[in-house]
Curated annotation (Swiss-Prot):
May be involved in a late step of spore wall assembly. This is Outer spore wall protein 1. It comes from the Eukaryota. Transmembrane segments: none annotated.
C-alpha cells in the first residue's frame, strides 16, 4: 500500500513573507528598536534626573494594564521588566529584553536575552542619611514604579512584577525570645496570647492564624526549659542504647571489628567518652 503524498506547499506564503519584509524595510522597525535600546542604555548612566514626588496614587502604577488597553506603539518598543523581590523598601531589579549578540554570530540559538539594567537612579531616595530605611508604606511601591515609567516609558514597554503576588509575608514569627529579653517581667500567659495572635498573610486578602493550626503552634508553646529537658533525655537514651549494645557484645564473646565505637564509663566522673578502635 502506497503512502499518501505530502501536501503541496502554497506559493502564497512567499508573497506574504516578502510583503512583511518590505514593510519592515520601509518603516525602519529594526532601526527604531535598536534606537530605543540605545537610549535606554544612555539613561541608565544618567543620574541627573529631577523627578518630582507623587501628588496622588495612580491606578496604573499598582497594576499591569491588559495588553488590549496598551497603546500599539508600546508593542514596537523593547520590553523592560521591573520586579521587587525584597519588597518596596529595597531597590527594584530591572531587566531589558534585547537581541542576543551570540545569535548573530551563530554561536547560540537563543535569539533574545534579559540584560540587567543599572537601577541606582530608582533606589536613591529609599534610604535616609543615617542609613536607616524609611517606613514601608502602601504608596512607596507606586512611587518607585512612577519613577521607572517617567525615565523609561518613552523608549520601553514597562511591565512590573509586584512583590505581593504569590509571596508569603510573616509578622512576629520567631520574635518571642526577643520579647522575653526586653520584658523579663512578662507572664507566660501573656506571651502565649501574643503568640496565638500571630497571623501569616497571603497578599492582602487572605490570612491565617497560627493558633488554629497545631503543626504551626505546637513549637511556640514549648518553653526553653522543656526543650532543654527533651534534648538531655534524648541524648541519655541514645547513650544508654549504645552502652547496652556494647556490653551485650562483650558478654557474648563477639570479636571486635574495625571501626567500632567503644564506650568507656568512668567511675568518679559522670562522663561518657567515645573512641575508635583502629
Amino acid at each position: 500500500m502506497r503512502a499518501p503524498p505530502s501536501p503541496r506547499k502554497s506559493k502564497s506564503g512567499h508573497f506574504f513573507y516578502l510583503y512583511f519584509r518590505l514593510c519592515q524595510l520601509f518603516s525602519g522597525r529594526k532601526l527604531k528598536r535598536r534606537w530605543h535600546v540605545h537610549k535606554l542604555h544612555i539613561h541608565q548612566y544618567n543620574t541627573r534626573w529631577n523627578l518630582s514626588p507623587l501628588s496622588e496614587i495612580h491606578i496604573e502604577d499598582m497594576i499591569n494594564e491588559p495588553s488590549g488597553l496598551c497603546p500599539g506603539s508600546s508593542k514596537k518598543k523593547p520590553l523592560l521588566i521591573a520586579r521587587f523581590p525584597k519588597g518596596c523598601q529595597e531597590s527594584p531589579r530591572v531587566y531589558v529584553l534585547q537581541r542576543n549578540n551570540l545569535s548573530r554570530l551563530k554561536l547560540s540559538k537563543r535569539k533574545y536575552a534579559l540584560r540587567f539594567y543599572h537601577n541606582e537612579i530608582f533606589g536613591n531616595n529609599l534610604k535616609r542619611k543615617d542609613g536607616s530605611i524609611h517606613k514601608v508604606e502602601h504608596q512607596q511601591c507606586a512611587e518607585t514604579v512612577r519613577k521607572i515609567k517617567k525615565v523609561t516609558a518613552n523608549h520601553a514597554d514597562v511591565k512590573i512584577i509586584f512583590h505581593d503576588k504569590n509571596t508569603i509575608r510573616s509578622d512576629k514569627l520567631g520574635g518571642r525570645s526577643n520579647k522575653m529579653q526586653t520584658r523579663p517581667s512578662v507572664l507566660e500567659e501573656d506571651v502565649e496570647e501574643e503568640v496565638s495572635s500571630v497571623y501569616i498573610r497571603f497578599c492582602d486578602d487572605h490570612s491565617l492564624r497560627v493558633k488554629d493550626y497545631h503543626s504551626l503552634h505546637r513549637h511556640s508553646k514549648k518553653s526553653s526549659k522543656e526543650k532543654r529537658n527533651n534534648q538531655e533525655i534524648g541524648k541519655s537514651k541514645l547513650l544508654g542504647k549504645l552502652f547496652e549494645e556494647e556490653t551485650s557484645r562483650q558478654n557474648k564473646g563477639v570479636e571486635k571489628k574495625l571501626d567500632t565505637i567503644v564506650i568507656q564509663k568512668f567511675q568518679n566522673y559522670p562522663i561518657v567518652s567515645f573512641s575508635r578502635v583502629i
